[in-house]
């Protein structure tokens, strides 16, 4: 990765503008999960300890661009940062004329999405951000796939543009899993639809030794063998793609399934289920998880892996009745000696549910950015940092 790194720069007395992902869930003015704020702390502390004048920026929610809306204000985030850093962090609403800070001070610009032109990567807005700093630090991997003024444009015009520790860590982990993986490399991809993950499956099939599919994706592969899948979620039109992938790489999917006849609007933690061989599913049944044989087989594959990339659950794990497959495979990843990289919202929820965060080598904070990187797409914000580093 040929980008400048914040840790290599002398920041003493410099105005340092850090783009972070502080887009946290807020209910009735209270932050319900501060995971992203906690993740941003090492970068902020590094800049403060280096004697920089630290200015932070982030988006929050989806306000109407160009309009101030109190519910999307970053004030609760600033209050939490003040607590965690033990120093006052003010929210700056009117920053165009510049922000006066002493060395070691920290302030937070108000929600970047209140600024007209943010999403369009507006040049004038990008230059206005750039004028606030001597060094711009991109540290928000979760927004690196968007070319916007606070992620991409500002990096173009800032005197110096570099990657923060969080972004650099993400890129290193992705490179370790995808560019030069220790083998065997196993990719576990779950989720509802083949269509939304087809490019991911394609890209991973070229890198991994074994491609394991779960969830609704597995159902489409089961159907590609000519088997009945009853009421299960699957994509008939993508059966040819499933067959093609099976020819191109070793694909592992359900050989036995957990099924239910309970309509989905009545699902609960104790919904009744049955176990069926993959070729014995009845017309009125719906596949909602791996059967025990499949889960055990996948767990064994994961146990022998040296690199694991995990994106998506094996079943409808939100309900305990349908969660066993996800639980067994998640535990196998946690117990594995492999370098394991996990990403995507549902995956993080599963890691949370089974309390496995400290057993996964690297957990990616970016949903869309994670998938686009896996697909082999260039992330605009990272590409801009590379361009600036080459100057």
UniProtKB/Swiss-Prot annotation:
- Residue stretches spanning the membrane: none
Please name the HAMAP family in this protein's record. Answer: Phosphoglyc_kinase (MF_00145)
What phylogenetic lineage does the species belong to?
Answer: Bacteria, Pseudomonadati, Pseudomonadota, Gammaproteobacteria, Cellvibrionales
Organism this protein belongs to: Teredinibacter turnerae (strain ATCC 39867 / T7901)
Q: Report which reactions are catalysed by this protein.
A: (2R)-3-phosphoglycerate + ATP = (2R)-3-phospho-glyceroyl phosphate + ADP
Quote one Gene Ontology molecular function term. ADP binding
Q: Does the keyword Transferase apply?
A: yes
Q: Which gene encodes it?
A: pgk
Q: What keywords does the record list, in alphabetical order?
A: ATP-binding, Cytoplasm, Glycolysis, Kinase, Nucleotide-binding, Transferase
Q: What is this protein called?
A: Phosphoglycerate kinase
Q: What is its EC number?
A: 2.7.2.3
* Keyword Magnesium found: no
Which InterPro entries does the UniProt entry name for this protein?
A: Phosphoglycerate_kinase (IPR001576), Phosphoglycerate_kinase_CS (IPR015911), Phosphoglycerate_kinase_N (IPR015824), Phosphoglycerate_kinase_sf (IPR036043)
């Amino acid at each position: 990765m040929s980008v400048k790194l914040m840790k290599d720069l002398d920041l003493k007395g410099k105005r340092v503008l850090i783009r972070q992902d502080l887009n946290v869930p807020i209910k009735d003015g209270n932050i319900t999960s501060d995971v992203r704020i906690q993740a941003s702390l090492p970068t902020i502390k590094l800049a403060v300890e280096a004697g920089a004048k630290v200015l932070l920026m982030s988006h929050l929610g989806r306000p109407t661009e160009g309009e101030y809306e109190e519910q999307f204000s970053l004030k609760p985030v600033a209050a939490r940062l003040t607590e965690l850093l033990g120093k006052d962090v003010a929210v700056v609403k009117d920053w165009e004329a510049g922000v006066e800070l002493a060395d070691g001070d920290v302030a937070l610009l108000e929600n970047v999405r209140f600024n007209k032109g943010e999403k369009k990567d507006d040049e004038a807005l990008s230059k206005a951000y750039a004028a606030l700093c001597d060094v711009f630090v991109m540290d928000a991997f979760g927004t690196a796939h968007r070319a916007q003024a606070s992620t991409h444009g500002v990096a173009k015009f800032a005197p110096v543009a570099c990657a923060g520790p969080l972004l650099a860590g993400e890129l290193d982990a992705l490179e370790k899993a995808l560019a030069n993986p220790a083998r065997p490399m196993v990719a576990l991809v779950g989720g509802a639809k083949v269509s939304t993950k087809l490019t991911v499956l394609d890209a991973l099939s070229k890198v991994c030794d074994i491609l394991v599919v779960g969830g609704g994706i597995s159902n489409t592969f089961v159907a590609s063998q000519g088997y009945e899948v009853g009421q299960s979620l699957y994509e008939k039109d993508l059966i040819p793609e499933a067959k093609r992938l099976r020819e191109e790489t070793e694909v592992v999917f359900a050989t036995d399934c957990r099924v239910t006849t309970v309509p989905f609007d009545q699902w609960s933690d104790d919904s009744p289920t049955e176990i069926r061989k993959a070729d014995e599913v009845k017309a009125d049944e719906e596949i909602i998880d791996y059967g025990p044989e499949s889960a055990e087989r996948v767990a064994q594959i994961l146990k022998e892996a040296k690199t694991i990339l995990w994106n998506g659950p094996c079943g409808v794990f939100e309900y305990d009745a349908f969660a066993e497959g996800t639980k067994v495979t998640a535990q196998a990843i946690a117990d594995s000696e492999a370098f394991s990289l996990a990403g995507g919202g549902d995956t993080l929820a599963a890691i949370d549910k089974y309390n496995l965060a400290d057993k996964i080598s690297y957990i990616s904070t970016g949903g869309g950015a994670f998938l686009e990187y896996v697909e082999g797409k260039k992330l605009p914000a990272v590409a801009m940092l590379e361009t600036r580093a080459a100057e």
